[in-house]
Amino acid sequence: MTREAWIIDAVRSPRGKGKENGALHNVHPQRILAQVLNALRDRVGFDTAEVDDVVMGCGAGSGDHSMDIARMAALDAGWSLDAPGVTLNRFCGSGQQAVMFAAQ
């Protein structure tokens, strides 16, 4: 584990499942987040084995968003099994809280 926290980039997913007839309604949130994680990996070009932690903000931590979606999405994306994950919920401030937590 490194002694310094490095935030190398930030990404976000579409809003979510949305309306019942919406394009993403039948896509599991974990799968959406896995695609975001892989897009980040591809854009920055890093080895997921070097990731010390996966920190995500999620304002709706129930139902299919539960069970630590950050960790589950990292596993779904095929990232290293060694990186833990944490999901933070501050409702509208979840993303900002995740960035501040990761920087500590």
Place the predicted regions along the sequence by residue.
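Conserved active-site "lid/cap" helical segment
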Residues: 1-77
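Conserved catalytic cysteine-centered active-site region
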Residues: 58-104
